[in-house]
């Protein structure tokens, strides 16, 4: 039996998670649906992942031409529509975490599966935060709304590979404090 291969699906190489809203869906505003989301920061040196993403965007474009065309007479060229692969050096020049990297914002209305390096489910919310390193399975698809059209990125699953420096200026409690040895430490 042959396993189906979705050309619009990518499992990334090691990337860094930013704006990680993976435990609770959040709405961007009062008129939008709550979604789980993450920004995947991909080093520009990971050319294998970047090429897989570009190929998946192309596949989503070809698959979604009817949707992208909408009521128009023709399908807009891929270069003229919104795509999710963005250059951190150009779009986030003041953010060190995005230096020499591309990024993709992925979201979903359903919760992603979250596992560790051994593929064991992670239940402790403190294990996944903005700054952690891991991999993600993502899918690309065409969209056409009243205000824009393009290719979007859907979040499927997350795999944590290792801890990283927390992003957003929030430190972890276990990093801020040492173990207290003296029972009478208040005096």
State where each predicted segment sits.
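OB-fold ssDNA-binding interfaces and closely related basic DNA-contact patches used
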Residues: 1-103
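Acidic-enriched, low-complexity/disordered segments with a strong bias for Aspartate over Glutamate
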Residues: 29, 46, 87-89, 94-95, ...
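Compact mixed alphabeta submodule
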Residues: 119-187
């Amino acid at each position: 039996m042959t396993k189906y291969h979705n050309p619009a699906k990518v499992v990334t190489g090691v990337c860094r998670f930013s704006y990680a809203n993976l435990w609770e869906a959040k709405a961007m505003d009062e008129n939008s649906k709550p979604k789980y989301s993450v920004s995947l920061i991909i080093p520009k040196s990971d050319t294998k992942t970047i090429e897989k993403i570009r190929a998946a965007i192309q596949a989503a474009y070809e698959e979604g031409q009817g949707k992208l065309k909408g009521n128009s007479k023709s399908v807009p060229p891929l270069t003229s529509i919104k795509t999710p692969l963005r250059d951190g050096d150009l779009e986030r020049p003041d953010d060190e975490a995005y230096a020499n990297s591309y990024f993709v914002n992925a979201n979903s209305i359903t919760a992603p599966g979250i596992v560790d390096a051994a593929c064991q489910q992670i239940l402790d919310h403190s294990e996944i935060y903005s700054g952690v390193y891991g991999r993600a399975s993502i899918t690309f698809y065409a969209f056409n709304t009243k205000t824009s059209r393009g290719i979007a990125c859907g979040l499927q699953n997350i795999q944590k590979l290792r801890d990283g420096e927390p992003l957003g200026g929030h430190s972890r409690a276990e990093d801020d404090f040492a173990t207290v040895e003296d029972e009478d430490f208040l005096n």
